[in-house]
């Protein structure tokens, strides 16, 4: 969180989302367990304490710092004999040698059923650390009075209002600063922080398309194109991580 591409308002959004998640998990029998520290040290302590032999996590494409951290975690797990199982969260594929067939793979993933949340979670013998405030981890205050609030329920409400009313002028209004804030979905942070899944947004869009309402075919098609673009451009970063530091085209490297 001290990287130059992070901010206090992003952390506040995450904090609100985590509080809401903690409440939902507690209602199912097991609150969220938070640990603060370096990833390898925290995971090593948890695995030793609870005799963990397998870790489940999701794939992400972020920046050079997180990539280095992830490699450290994978190397530690390999040396410790701990199995790592990674789950794909977007339509981004690891270690692709060709983009041929990418769109078909995207559609295949997004059309799989969404898994329901469990009704009950078994309790674990673990005490949670306190969720750190911004000043605890060296993040400068970054007030933004009209920013979006982090919370799955808030994201679902935005998605509902987009498909019911706000999104009807989406295609025409998205490029207009005066109208875009109301007519666009505003789902980006909820997708980025996992409050809503890409598959969930895609399948809701497909369901709305099937309603066949007059005047909605074009905006829904445009919205679905943006969902594809989301993963298309992240795939570029996955395939070319050096793009964070170098121009995409090698002809510009010496400039």
Regions from the language model: what does each represent?
Residues 80-83, 101-253:
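Glycine/tryptophan-enriched, flexible segments
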Residues 1-119:
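Trp/Phe/Arg-rich N-terminal binding region typifying the photolyase-homology
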């Amino acid at each position: 969180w001290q990287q130059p591409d992070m901010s206090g308002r992003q952390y506040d959004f995450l904090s609100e989302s985590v509080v809401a998640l903690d409440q939902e998990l507690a209602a199912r029998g097991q609150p969220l367990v938070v640990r603060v520290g370096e990833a390898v040290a925290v995971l090593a302590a948890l695995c030793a304490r609870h005799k963990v032999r397998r870790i489940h996590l999701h794939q992400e494409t972020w920046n050079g710092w997180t990539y280095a951290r992830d490699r450290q975690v994978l190397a530690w797990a390999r040396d410790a004999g701990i199995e790592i199982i990674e789950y794909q969260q977007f339509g981004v594929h690891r270690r692709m040698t060709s983009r041929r067939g990418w769109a078909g793979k995207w559609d295949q993933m997004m059309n799989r059923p969404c898994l329901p949340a469990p009704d009950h979670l078994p309790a674990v013998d673990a005490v949670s650390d306190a969720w750190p405030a911004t000043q605890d981890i060296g993040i400068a205050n970054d007030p933004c009075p009209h920013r979006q609030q982090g919370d799955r329920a808030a994201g679902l409400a935005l998605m509902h209002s987009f498909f019911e009313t706000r999104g009807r002028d989406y295609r025409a209004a998205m490029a207009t600063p005066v109208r875009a804030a109301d007519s666009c979905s505003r789902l980006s942070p909820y997708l980025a922080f996992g409050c809503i899944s890409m598959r969930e947004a895609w399948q809701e869009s497909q369901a709305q398309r099937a309603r066949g309402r007059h005047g909605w075919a074009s905006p829904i098609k445009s919205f679905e194109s943006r969902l594809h673009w989301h993963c298309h451009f992240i795939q570029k970063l996955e395939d070319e991580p050096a793009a964070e530091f170098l121009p995409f085209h090698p002809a510009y490297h010496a400039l």
